[in-house]
Amino acid sequence: MVDNQVSAAVIIGIAKTQDKQEAFIQVFHTLCQSMEKVSYDIKDFVYQEEPFSISIKNSIFKKHYIHIEDSKLSTVIDLELDMPLHIQTTKYAPTIMGPFAYLKNMQCNHAILNLESQTHGYMKYQNQIYNIQGIIYQEKDWGNSFPKKYIWVQSNCCLQKKQFYFYRVPQFH
């Protein structure tokens, strides 16, 4: 999420190792220049595919709405998303991964939920409320591993008409 006052990145997910399974929420933003992470019991992670929804305790992530709130986080975020921009899908390319999306043994899968949309709402940090009027991008990754090396470049803060270019060099070992 980016607006004129603040930029923020939120990562929600599930991490599984042989010893431990956890759900988590990570929040980074430009007001504190640090990252906060809260871990949860994996049972607190509730996913629904249609309509898309994820909840972790009091935090909710939907196609048109995001609310993040936990007493262990110094930040509360409440945003509505307007007119999400989706990538056109085809049988050849059901996700950004193209035909690789059909391979069931991929270690990591990637999809873009929302390439860009306008967002409005508020972010509360250290008892100060920041009214947000900005843009937001949403993606999801899933699988049993994540690449050791990758490059992701994106910019949505352009004055000109929307243009998107994708470039990916797969690295196989």
What kind of region is each of these model predictions?
Residues 1-173:
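Structured soluble/peripheral alpha/beta segments that form catalytic or ligand/cofactor-binding pockets
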